[in-house]
Amino acid sequence: MKLQNSFRDYTAESALFVRRALVAFLGILLLTGVLIANLYNLQIVRFTDYQTRSNENRIKLVPIAPSRGIIYDRNGIPLALNRTIYQIEMMPEKVDNVQQTLDALRSVVDLTDDDIAAFRKERARSHRFTSIPVKTNLTEVQVARFAVNQYRFPGVEVKGYKRRYYPYGSALTHVIGYVSKINDKDVERLNNDGKLANYAATHDIGKLGIERYYEDVLHGQTGYEEVEVNNRGRVIRQLKEVPPQAGHDIYLTLDLKLQQYIETLLAGSRAAVVVTDPRTGGVLALVSTPSYDPNLFVDGISSKDYSALLNDPNTPLVNRATQGVYPPASTVKPYVAVSALSAGVITRNTTLFDPGWWQLPGSEKRYRDWKKWGHGRLNVTRSLEESSDTFFYQVAYDMGIDRLSEWMGKFGYGHYTGIDLAEERSGNMPTREWKQKRFKKPWYQGDTIPVGIGQGYWTATPIQMSKALMILINDGIVKVPHLLMSTAEDGKQVPWVQPHEPPVGDIHSGYWELAKDGMYGVANRPNGTAHKYFASAPYKIAAKSGTAQVFGLKANETYNAHKIAERLRDHKQMTAFAPYNNPQVAVAMILENGGAGPAVGTLMRQILDHIMLGDNNTDLPAENPAVAAAEDH
């Protein structure tokens, strides 16, 4: 048995220790180097990046909404203004139990089921950490009640905002329009137009009328403030502020009192009236009835209220003055006369015998005159005074649809008028091409005949009727109807500028005076179809009435409004201007199905007297309904 070596090799152990210590030291040195390198990267290389991130957590940019421009009438009366409202808002991510919080708020701020439904709808389309309205238009009592109980509702606060308000309600809805909450379509459009950033602090946008058309002018430029916040998100101090730029105030050509007066006259009727100054094209009144209160839409209309408007058989949502399309009827006869004279189809001396009907050559088809026993021998002026259909059947036949549609297009029919409202329809000025495309059928000669009296396939809006009337008054010089009078910029009024358009025909032909003389005869001469309404006026009026058929009669039938359903009765129309020798006002009017009140001539006289005399109680002769119906041609 060998003896165990009890001696240790201290030299070897020492060398091993040194090697291990060296490895450990090198490891520590390497790790320290990595740490120093990383620290250098964080503190030196990426200092700016991390400083920015830190500031973003500490410093916030808060957008500041601009004040929306005020809309005034021509006399400086505010038609759309801003007022401060308070609303309660919630950031759901800061609330432990949203439903319990909503339930608790019911008794504090009188929260309703509709309010909660609107909140949930808005929450569904909002981003996280967005403050969402719970209830708007808080009363002073509700604000005070919440202030006392605010400690119970973390994540909920009351904020003040400027809200649009329309003090005259339904009287101006179809002109002024309204603003309402920005929706997804608005966001998409603003983003595509590069304007979304300017709406960072804005809840509303123009949806209709002037508010929509002049949105860029009225909105202004969003400002912002740079604030420092603590770790709870509360503002500690303001670092910088760039104030918002308020939107521009605008002044309209409208006369509020005239607008309200006409709306009162049309109460209960489906009707439209456009009043213009033919010297400038400025719209003095644009009324469409029935209407509705635009304030309903500002904070978001309830589904119940919107459904009621949408399903109303009287269609209050439609602006009849610019979107209602009707056969223009006999109101176009003066323009057809000027066109036929200008085209050489007729002359000043052309005459025609009217037996009460006109027969299409080579056919047994007869077209009846509204006066079944006829008007006898007619020239151009008398055919306008008595509104002979037969005379204009012949004119339409001789002109043909190509020339007729071309000339009426020059008067603006079938085209947008250029009025500063997005809600406009162009109507229809029929052509061969239109019929082929629409019905896959050729144009027949018989289609042309009713076009000569503003019937058939021809449809137009009251604003188009107004523009055509101004062209006639100005002897072919075109005035675009407009609502904007001026814009307030830097303390100055910048006026709206009438665009230049080529004149219609020869402004020195004398044909314009011939047509206007015919309209003068309508209102003033014994054989004029509307003389009983206007002959007694202390100023001179020129007018032209029209009847647009809704329900077709058989050859042996006679029209009787009392035996026809109300919706099938004829539309009554009239255009007029005054004073005759120096026109200052032009009016176009339509009463759907004849209206619910006085005759169209009575209403026209009342409007003109109100403007020319300031007389709101025009004394007119008693009306015989049967005679009135016959005279409204």
Task: State what each model feature region is.
Residues 1-303, 325, 347-348, 353, ...:
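Periplasmic/cell-envelope proteins involved in peptidoglycan metabolism and beta-lactam response
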